[in-house]
């Protein structure tokens, strides 16, 4: 696998230690990201944490702030911007590094980090794609504005169900997992 990712800087703080990576996309998330990363530290025994940063200026995702908390920091230096570009960089990196699967979550503190072991379990069981949901039994969301919740539940999800023929409960959720096979499938 070659690295077809947009231009970026890579800061590797230690070697790969797990078959799965947790990729967190951030851009000036500040204290929300700092609190989320602290909550994720206990999971470093299960996954390598990779930060995909859009060249934030808030300092929360600087190399000095992260060097003892994550495996790798990837900083987008390309003219292309947006969360999808950050994930392209991180997924290409994860494939080059040989990870068996990748779990993605946004760095805004809105995803329930306690579900991370379930994602790892499902990847180990052979699932190729796992989609998080804030709206299923046991689902969780924090700090999501009510107009966004209503729009997702009663506008976007029904449209996605109709278009895809699949019973999505939260197609907008950025908390998802993918196997290596899924990522490499043309």
Predicted regions: what they are:
Residues 20, 72, 100, 128:
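Conserved acidic residues
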């Amino acid at each position: 696998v070659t690295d077809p990712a947009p231009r970026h800087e890579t800061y590797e703080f230690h070697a790969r230690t797990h078959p799965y990576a947790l990729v967190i996309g951030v851009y000036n998330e500040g204290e929300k990201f700092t609190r989320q990363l602290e909550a994720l530290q206990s999971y470093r025994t299960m996954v390598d944490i990779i930060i995909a940063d859009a060249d934030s200026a808030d300092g929360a995702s600087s190399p000095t702030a992260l060097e003892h908390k994550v495996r790798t920091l990837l900083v987008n230096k390309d003219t292309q911007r947006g969360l999808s570009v950050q994930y392209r960089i991180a997924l290409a990196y994860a494939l080059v590094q040989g990870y068996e699967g990748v779990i993605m979550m946004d760095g805004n503190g809105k995803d329930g980090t306690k579900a991370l072991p379930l994602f790892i379990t499902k990847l180990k069981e052979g699932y190729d794609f796992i989609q998080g949901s804030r709206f299923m039994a046991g689902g969780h969301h924090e700090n999501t504005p009510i107009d966004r919740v209503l729009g997702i539940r009663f506008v976007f999800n029904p449209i996605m169900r109709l278009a895809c023929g699949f019973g999505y409960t939260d197609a907008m959720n950025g908390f998802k997992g993918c196997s290596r096979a899924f990522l490499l499938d043309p």
